[in-house]
Amino acid sequence: MNKPVHNNEHRRKRFNKKCPFVSAGWKTIDYKDTETLKKFITERGKILPRRITGVSSRFQGTLTLAIKRARHIGLLPFVAED
């Protein structure tokens, strides 16, 4: 009978994340820039999703490709180093 009018406890505030590559004016992502690529990889070696990083869909694809290229060449590890 006594239901709360608004249950805001479980709602999260949404805000638009700006793509770091668009705001910095990047045209492409270089696979040799390992310091930038490491920011978008977890400590386990997984690529972070767009909803966490805020990267646009265009740059998420190029970022994924750059990370995979860097892994195949040996610039980035495939898995975490224990």
From Swiss-Prot:
GO terms for cellular component: cytosolic small ribosomal subunit
Residue ranges crossing the lipid bilayer per the database entry: none
Gene Ontology terms for molecular function: small ribosomal subunit rRNA binding; structural constituent of ribosome
Gene3D superfamilies found in the cross-reference section: Ribosomal protein S18
Protein keywords: Ribonucleoprotein, Ribosomal protein, RNA-binding, rRNA-binding
UniProt-listed GO biological process terms: translation
Keyword Ribonucleoprotein: yes
This protein's record includes keyword Aminoacyl-tRNA synthetase: no
Pfam families for the chain: Ribosomal_S18 (PF01084)
Function: Binds as a heterodimer with protein bS6 to the central domain of the 16S rRNA, where it helps stabilize the platform of the 30S subunit.
Subunit structure: Part of the 30S ribosomal subunit. Forms a tight heterodimer with protein bS6.
The family this protein is said to belong to: Belongs to the bacterial ribosomal protein bS18 family.
NCBIfam families hit by this protein: S18
Protein name in UniProt: Small ribosomal subunit protein bS18
Native species: Chlamydia caviae (strain ATCC VR-813 / DSM 19441 / 03DC25 / GPIC) (Chlamydophila caviae)
Phylogenetic lineage: Bacteria, Pseudomonadati, Chlamydiota, Chlamydiia, Chlamydiales
